[in-house]
């Protein structure tokens, strides 16, 4: 049986746009966990807070479920998929209304040993 060397965590239906999430995820992909945490801590972005939580969850999964060492972990996968869109309307002039799409994302972060 092969030894498990990776763990992942997901946050589903998060109220942040997947497009904006990807901008932050691109910064941490391939980095060590310590570097990724430092980057996310100082990124002034709503998505960064959520991604930091998911990253910490993935690290905890690796340590508790698979006995991996945090010092050797690298962010192997980081991606955001589109979640369900909440459709809303904004009232406009002359009794009309404009549609507003409030987008959500499914964020996945995977960590693996070097």
UniProtKB/Swiss-Prot annotation:
UniProt cross-references to InterPro entries, sorted A to Z: Ribosomal_uL22, Ribosomal_uL22_bac/chlpt-type, Ribosomal_uL22_bac/org-type, Ribosomal_uL22_CS, Ribosomal_uL22_sf
UniProt keyword Cell cycle present: no
PROSITE patterns: RIBOSOMAL_L22
Record protein name field: Large ribosomal subunit protein uL22
Alphabetical UniProt keywords: Antibiotic resistance, Ribonucleoprotein, Ribosomal protein, RNA-binding, rRNA-binding
GO biological process, one term: translation
GO MF entry, a single one: rRNA binding
Protein family per UniProt: Belongs to the universal ribosomal protein uL22 family.
Coiled-coil annotated spans: none
Organism expressing this protein natively: Streptococcus pneumoniae serotype 4 (strain ATCC BAA-334 / TIGR4)
Free-text function comment from the UniProt entry: This protein binds specifically to 23S rRNA; its binding is stimulated by other ribosomal proteins, e.g. L4, L17, and L20. It is important during the early stages of 50S assembly. It makes multiple contacts with different domains of the 23S rRNA in the assembled 50S subunit and ribosome.
